[in-house]
Amino acid sequence: MRTPLARVRSLGASHSGTSDFWRQRLTAAAMVLLIVPVIVVVIMLLGRNQAGAAQILGSLPIAIILLLFIVASTWHMKIGMQVVIEDYVHHEKLKLASIMANNFFCFAVATASIYAILKLSSGV
């Protein structure tokens, strides 16, 4: 049973825990499948300058693998930190501010990473 204030704030038992649980498992499975190719790409990039890195990242399959890994890992990070914040931050204003900061941080990391991969893969 939620109070009207809790409904407005969208905090409390929203019965979305199961979907968050499965989303986190889905992103974890995606990262498990993508980690070996990502490690291979990182090893290929060791010791290369920007031109060499752009040449390797210019390959469409490699860029796609890295982009998928970035999206999966930042989404996984967002969900995991949100669960920790919801469980352990008890002051409502601090909880709301922390969730907003978490969302902003994860979006910023994903955006910057995607931009970097796209810029390097385009050869600019």
Where in the sequence are the language-model features?
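Membrane-embedded alpha-helical bundles that constitute the cytochrome b-like, heme-associated redox core
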Residues: 1-124
